[in-house]
């Protein structure tokens, strides 16, 4: 029982060390470049797809009615 408790205690300090770093908010230039894709940080592939698709979405102009 004591061994399992020690393992859990050893994992917690590592997680606590990573969290305290404050995240700097993205600048207006970065928001204009990447838009909502800045919130996607879990999967780098998904993030790159959103960054690559974003300029195409902006450049698309619907035909006037």
UniProtKB/Swiss-Prot annotation:
<dbReference type="InterPro" id="IPR008726">
    <property type="entry name" value="Poxvirus_F8"/>
</dbReference>
<protein>
    <recommendedName>
        <fullName>Protein OPG052</fullName>
    </recommendedName>
</protein>
<feature type="region of interest" description="Disordered">
    <location>
        <begin position="1"/>
        <end position="29"/>
    </location>
</feature>
<feature type="compositionally biased region" description="Basic residues">
    <location>
        <begin position="1"/>
        <end position="10"/>
    </location>
</feature>
<comment type="similarity">
    <text>Belongs to the orthopoxvirus OPG052 family.</text>
</comment>
<dbReference type="Pfam" id="PF05886">
    <property type="entry name" value="Orthopox_F8"/>
</dbReference>
<feature type="compositionally biased region" description="Basic and acidic residues">
    <location>
        <begin position="11"/>
        <end position="21"/>
    </location>
</feature>
<keyword id="KW-0244">Early protein</keyword>
């Amino acid at each position: 029982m004591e061994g399992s408790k020690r393992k859990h205690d050893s994992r917690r300090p590592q997680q606590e060390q990573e969290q305290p770093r404050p995240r700097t908010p993205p600048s207006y230039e970065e928001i204009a470049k990447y838009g909502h894709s800045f919130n996607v940080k879990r999967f780098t592939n998904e993030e790159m797809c959103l960054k690559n698709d974003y300029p195409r979405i902006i450049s698309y102009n619907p035909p006037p009615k």
